[in-house]
Amino acid sequence: RVISMSNNHSYDKGAQGIAATLRFWDDMPDDVVTTGLYAGEADYGNIPIQEKEGVRIAYLAYTETTNGLPTPSDAAANVIYTSQEDVIQQQIELARQQADIVVVGVHWGVEGSHTPTDAQRALGQKIADWGADVIIGTHPHVIQPVELLTAAGTGKTVPIAYSLGNFVSTQAAANNMVGVILTFDITKTT
């Protein structure tokens, strides 16, 4: 079980909300992995990894926006924005060294749009090039395409789901009532 805490609502309730979120998820069983909130820059190297049947899986999460809210000055943790490409690259490369599979979640794009933006496509390709194995997008509240990218240098095929739509929502528009569950098999070969 993996919980991404990096999205446009991460800062909605300020430092108290961040602290309450961290406390809640810290009390979960050990098989629950959280990602997307970091206790400052010193914590960026702490890559969330879960081992399943001998396969080490790293989970990273980023957000494009926090709806204009800055990181609260007294917050116990912060998100990493999609504009922080140097940090994202460093984390993916570090995760690649520590794990067999690197899964990257990105909260991005335009709400209500079925078409990925140029920025989504560009960052998605960079994330693939930096070493991600799977890229899972959220935020638009509607389904966007699932495609296969080719990582530069390695030629590795990297699936990207630009937006899974809504899983559970109170939004009434027909397009907002549809979501996708992305499934994939992981097989360790070496």
Regions found by a protein language model. Give the residues of each.
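Acidic, metal/ion-coordinating pockets
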Residues: 1-190
